[in-house]
Amino acid sequence: MWLKSEGFALGKGGVEDGRHEVLYNRAISTWFDVQVGVRTDLDSGTSRQWAALGVRGMLPHFVEMEATAYASDNGHFAARIGLHYDLRLTQRWVLQPEIDLNVYSKTDPGRHVGSGLASLDAGVRLRYEITRKFAPYVGVTYSGRYGQTARFARQESEAATAVQVVFGIRSWF
């Protein structure tokens, strides 16, 4: 079972890009798992619930991949593809470059998302593994919104691209 939660806290008390998933995970080979479950988008925009079906695993050269397809109750479809690589600097320090792409089948004005390639996030995180299951991290991320998604951002007086400093805690149990 996987519980995934991601979002950005805004200075004015809101949440942006709040994405929460509960997924059942099953190994289908030595290197890959299939995941099925639900995703809920909760933030200052319109809430949306999705059914999720995905694959995650290890590609050659130890690149971790995650690809998930989503279908909502109102006929919207989406896909999220992510790649990252753990570069061990020492036994505890890990540098992790990563890239995530989000694609949508339809424009969704309530969520300020356009069809096609909606966003790309690329960055690098440095984490210190206190234990393998608990590691604080700090990093820098480039976030780009494209097409109609970028136009929605500009209508709200937001930038279509941004570079952000991120920090958090990575944990699993």
Language-model segments: residues:
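Hydrophobic, lipid-facing positions within transmembrane beta-strands of outer-membrane proteins
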Residues: 18-22, 49-53, 63, 77-81, ...
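Residue-level signature of outer-membrane beta-barrel architecture
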Residues: 1, 26, 57, 71, ...
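Histidine/lysine/aspartate-rich catalytic loop segments that bind and position anionic ligands
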Residues: 77-105
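Solvent-exposed loop/turn segments connecting transmembrane beta-strands
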Residues: 9-19, 40-50, 70-79, 89, ...
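Outer-membrane beta-barrel "beta-signal"
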Residues: 124-129, 159-173
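Outer-membrane beta-barrel initiation region
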Residues: 1-14, 25-26, 147, 165
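Transmembrane beta-strands of outer-membrane beta-barrel pores
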Residues: 7-11, 38-44, 59-61, 69-73, ...
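Repeated loop/turn-to-beta-strand initiation elements of outer-membrane beta-barrel proteins
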Residues: 1-3, 30-35, 61-65, 90-95, ...
